[in-house]
Amino acid sequence: MLETLRERLLSVQQDFTSGLKTLSDKSREAKVKGKPRTAPRLPKYSAGLELLSRYEDAWAALHRRAKECADAGELVDSEVVMLSAHWEKKRTSLNELQGQLQQLPALLQDLESLMASLAHLETSFEEVENHLLHLEDLCGQCELERHKQAQAQHLESYKKSKRKELEAFKAELDTEHTQKALEMEHTQQLKLKERQKFFEEAFQQDMEQYLSTGYLQIAERREPMGSMSSMEVNVDVLEQMDLMDISDQEALDVFLNSGGEDNIVMSPGVEMESNPNQNEMSLQIPSPSESASQPPASPSACTDLDTADAPLIQSDEEEVQVDTALVTLHTDRKSTPGVSDDSDQCDSTQDI
């Protein structure tokens, strides 16, 4: 292809030069034909000069165009050379591609064999993975059994140690219980003896005073509430009651005053010896909360006294007050059965 292009360029150049030659020959023939043959004429130098200058200009333009064509031909030649080199490279690459395409069937066969080997390897890998998982399960079971055995041994040792500690603690508790039981029994016996002694002394004092004076003056011999006898001795609830109704209290005062005048007539010596500032004995009815919270007092103790200026109460009047107090106490116990039950329980525990 390039050779034909070069041949065409050379033929164009030859045609161009041959055309120039023919033009020059025709111009010469025209000059020769244009001369008159019959009558000679004088040469005109100015016309020749113009014609020569015209020819020179034409030849200069032709030479310039020929040079431009030569430069363009050289440029085209260089481009053609570069194009030929490029096409040579492309031809070599096409040849290589053709050779590689010819090798494709063999490559496909190799790929098929590789795929088959990969499938076989995949199956073998799955089998190995299953075997490894089974081995891991076996190892885990062995480790679990070993851990179970260790924990069982540890549990047995812990049970033995705790059993020994429990036996020692039981023995210690048994010794402490026996010791405390002995101490409790001893203290209970001491309390019972002291209580019996206190009752005997109180009863003896009451009997002596009653035999000497004919009435009981309990307020003078009242123990403090914080003493042992007032806190631990079971006291009759009748000695802690007080008549809270004002009308009943006034009627009782009138009755007691009338009874006191009779007693003054019967025993004037006793009235002179008694202190006029002494308070009369009153029966206080405790509320359920107070009866549950207050500790029992001694059997010879009584409640607080009312205002002074009242005569002392004789034994006959005490029986009247006790009867009225029993009625009120019976009604209170019916209304509050829990308090009486608590007092009975306290009495039973103290008797024990």
From Swiss-Prot:
GO terms for biological process: actin cytoskeleton organization; anterograde axonal transport; anterograde synaptic vesicle transport; blood coagulation; cilium assembly; dendrite morphogenesis; kidney development; melanosome organization. Ubiquitinated by TRIM32. Ubiquitination leads to DTNBP1 degradation. Interacts with AP3M1 and TRIM32. Interacts (isoform 1 and isoform 2 only) with the DNA-dependent protein kinase complex DNA-PK; the interaction phosphorylates DTNBP1 in vitro. Interacts directly in this complex with XRCC5 and XRCC6. Interacts with XPO1; the interaction exports DTNBP1 out of the nucleus. Component of the biogenesis of lysosome-related organelles complex 1 (BLOC-1) composed of BLOC1S1, BLOC1S2, BLOC1S3, BLOC1S4, BLOC1S5, BLOC1S6, DTNBP1/BLOC1S7 and SNAPIN/BLOC1S8. The BLOC-1 complex associates with the AP-3 protein complex and membrane protein cargos. Residues 274-285 have a biased composition (Polar residues). Component of the BLOC-1 complex, a complex that is required for normal biogenesis of lysosome-related organelles (LRO), such as platelet dense granules and melanosomes. In concert with the AP-3 complex, the BLOC-1 complex is required to target membrane protein cargos into vesicles assembled at cell bodies for delivery into neurites and nerve terminals. The BLOC-1 complex, in association with SNARE proteins, is also proposed to be involved in neurite extension. Associates with the BLOC-2 complex to facilitate the transport of TYRP1 independent of AP-3 function. This is Dysbindin. A motif (Nuclear export signal) lies at residues 243-256. It comes from Mus musculus (Mouse). The modification Phosphoserine is found at residues 11, 315, 340, 343. Disruption phenotype: Null mice exhibit cognitive abnormalities including schizophrenia-related behaviors such as impaired working memory under stressful conditions. There is higher acoustic startle reactivity to stimuli. Pyramidal neurons are hypoexcitable on dopamine-2 receptor stimulation. There is reduced expression of Ca(2+)/calmodulin-dependent protein kinase II (CaMKII) and CaMKKbeta in the medial prefrontal cortex mPFC. There is increased expression levels of cell surface dopamine receptor D2 in cortical neurons. Expression levels of SYN1 are lower in both cortex and in the hippocampal formation (HF). Keywords: Albinism, Cell membrane, Coiled coil, Cytoplasm, Cytoplasmic vesicle, Endoplasmic reticulum, Endosome, Hermansky-Pudlak syndrome, Membrane, Nucleus, Phosphoprotein, Postsynaptic cell membrane, Sensory transduction, Synapse, Ubl conjugation. InterPro entries: Dysbindin. Residues 267-352 are annotated as: Disordered. Residues 173-325 are annotated as: Dysbindin. Residues 88-176 form a coiled coil. GO terms for cellular component: asymmetric synapse; axon; axon cytoplasm; BLOC-1 complex; cytoplasm; dendritic spine; endoplasmic reticulum membrane; endosome membrane. It comes from the Eukaryota. Detected in brain, in hippocampus and dentate gyrus neurons. Detected at axon bundles and axon terminals, notably in the cerebellum and hippocampus. Detected in neuropil in hippocampus, lateral septum, basal ganglia and substantia nigra. Highly expressed in pyramidal cells of hippocampus CA2 and CA3. Detected at the heart and skeletal muscle sarcolemma (at protein level). Ubiquitously expressed. The highest expression is observed in testis, liver, kidney, brain, heart and lung. Expressed at lower levels in stomach and small intestine. Belongs to the dysbindin family. Residues 286-301 have a biased composition (Low complexity). The keyword Isomerase does not apply. It is linked to Defects in Dtnbp1 are the cause of the sandy (sdy) mutant phenotype, a model for human Hermansky-Pudlak syndrome (HPS). Sdy mice lack dysbindin expression; they have a characteristic sandy coat color and have much fewer melanosomes in the retinal pigment epithelium and choroid. They are fully viable, but present behavioral abnormalities. They have prolonged bleeding times due to platelet storage pool deficiency, and lysosomal storage defects. The number of electron-opaque platelet dense granules is severely reduced, and the platelet serotonin content is strongly reduced. PANTHER family: DYSBINDIN, DYSTROBREVIN BINDING PROTEIN 1 DYSBINDIN.
